[in-house]
Swiss-Prot record:
Its EC number is 4.3.2.1. One of its GO terms (biological process) is L-arginine biosynthetic process. It holds the Pfam family Lyase_1. This is Argininosuccinate lyase. Pathway: Amino-acid biosynthesis; L-arginine biosynthesis; L-arginine from L-ornithine and carbamoyl phosphate: step 3/3. It catalyses: 2-(N(omega)-L-arginino)succinate = fumarate + L-arginine. Keywords: Amino-acid biosynthesis, Arginine biosynthesis, Cytoplasm, Lyase. GO terms for molecular function: argininosuccinate lyase activity. The gene is argH. One of its GO terms (cellular component) is cytosol. Its main location: cytoplasm. The lineage of its organism: Bacteria, Bacillati, Bacillota, Clostridia, Moorellales. It is found in: Cytoplasm.
């Protein structure tokens, strides 16, 4: 008979059992479920709801079940529905009547909420650690390429010269915001729901604070209805994960076209590339493409979870079972992408001369020329028009700024002098932008110092 079967006269239809069961995926919560049950048992013994001997028997039994699961000696029962009932069933079979007392003052509703929070309390730092590893690679590469000039783009059109270091540090900042979002999410995960019961708590004299201390939670939930129905923390994590994947996908997209012959800015290591079954010459950036593709998968989980929650009345509803596969797959996807993307980027070889040459082509110095005129006293809008006319003139004649004589420059504005030629070099364009947040090597060097301090703080936080 089901552990909840007292009021039923017929057994559950087999189709319903299969449809209803979540053990195929929620079994990964066994550690959290057992940890929560051990803390609950200690509390029950401490307040006198079970005897010390019963508490010891329950804890010993749970520890043995955990060891057996880890050793692969446990076969889960679909008929027991989920990880909670499977463990309770195993416990009762092993220790007898004491096992039946474990669920005193507890519901699966607050139990599963607890398990998910415990799970994320472990998994979020794991994601942060992987993310910090990628950030470290970005910082190290940036430090190597402070002087590497490359084109900066808007609308995927060459805009102004920057450095590869500056470009890479832009991604450091994106991932730093992701770190902050994960910290923020973890704050709201770190609330202990056990004691909320099915929805309205219990009349029994439990000690919720004791359980929270035992499990390392910083707070207990303030409302029992909210505690069992809240999955905001899951949505928040899925949203944070979606942003991580978005940033990975943006970088992946650049890796993909940078590694093409058309750009030729980098070459991926053979270990992180694949070939073609038909075309012998091909070297494909499949890792980056898969990261880009898997981003949509994570977005889908976020949208799906929002759709699950949008119409749920208080308190618990079975719809909430849909949270786990979305959460688990998102975690697996994000961690997997970070694990493979980091060494792929670390082993990539940047073609410095190709980047430098591309940065010098075209009219990337146009803004610098306009600002040259501004420094000479011309209003910016007039300077903009003058330089636009210069660009049009060069395009019509198939020439570049560097091809123009001083007389030709002065035919567009008498403010041009010999010093204009010093403004046209890509290095001058970059070095002239030595402002906080700018691409000049000195400014990027300071950004790298700040980034190293940030990473040290993240690592210190993960070590606590």
């Amino acid at each position: 008979m089901k552990l909840w079967g007292g009021r039923f006269t017929r057994t559950t239809d087999r189709l319903v059992e299969d449809f209803h069961s979540s053990i195929s995926f929620d079994q990964r919560l066994y550690k959290e479920d057992i940890a929560g049950s051990i803390a609950h048992a200690r509390m029950l013994a401490a307040v006198g709801l079970i005897t010390p001997a019963e508490g010891e028997a329950i804890i010993k039994g749970l520890e043995e079940i955990r060891a057996d699961i880890e050793a692969g000696r446990v076969t889960f029962d679909v008929g027991a529905e989920d990880i909670h009932m499977n463990i309770e069933k195993l416990l009762t079979e092993r220790i007898g009547e004491a096992g039946k007392k474990l669920h005193t003052a507890r519901s699966r509703n607050d139990q599963v909420a607890l398990d998910l929070r415990l799970y994320l309390k472990e998994e979020i730092p794991a994601v942060k650690k992987l993310l910090a590893g990628l950030q470290q690679v970005l910082v190290d590469l940036a430090a190597q390429h402070l002087q590497t000039i490359m084109p900066g783009y808007t609308h995927l059109q060459k805009a102004q010269p920057v450095t590869l270091a500056h470009h890479l540090m832009a991604y450091f900042e994106m991932f730093y915001r992701d770190q902050q979002r994960l910290d923020d999410c973890l704050d709201r995960v770190d609330v202990m729901p056990l004691g909320a019961g099915a929805l309205a708590g219990t009349t029994l004299p439990i000690d919720r604070e004791l359980v929270a201390r035992e499990l390392g939670f910083k707070a207990i939930s303030a409302n029992s209805l909210d505690a069992v129905s809240d999955r905001d923390f899951v949505v928040e994590f899925l949203a944070a994960a979606s942003l991580i994947m978005m940033h990975l996908s943006r970088l992946a997209e650049e890796v993909i076209f940078w590694s093409s012959e058309e750009f030729g800015f980098l070459e991926l290591d053979d270990a992180y590339s694949t070939g073609s079954s038909m075309m012998p010459q091909k070297k494909n950036p499949d890792v980056a493409e898969l990261v880009r593709g898997k981003t949509g998968r994570v977005y889908g989980h976020l949208m799906g979870m929002l759709a699950v929650l949008k119409g749920l009345p208080l308190a618990y509803n079975k719809d909430l079972q849909e949270d786990k596969e979305a959460l688990f797959d998102t975690l697996d996807t994000v961690k997997g992408c970070l694990m493979v993307f980091t060494p792929m980027l670390a082993t990539a070889r940047f073609r410095v001369e190709r980047m430098r040459a591309d940065a010098s082509r075209g009219f990337a110095a146009a803004t610098d020329v306009a600002e040259y005129l501004v420094r000479k006293g011309l209003p910016f809008r007039e300077a903009h028009a003058v330089v636009g006319s210069l660009v049009l003139h060069c395009l019509r004649e198939g020439r570049s700024f560097q091809d123009l004589s001083l007389e030709e420059w002065q035919s567009f504005s008498p403010l041009f002098d010999n010093d204009i030629f010093g403004c046209l070099e890509a290095e001058a364009c970059v070095n002239g932008r030595n402002l906080p947040g700018g691409p000049a090597p000195e400014a990027v060097g300071k950004a790298i110092e700040r980034a190293r301090e940030i990473l040290a703080g993240i690592q210190a936080g993960l070590s606590r």
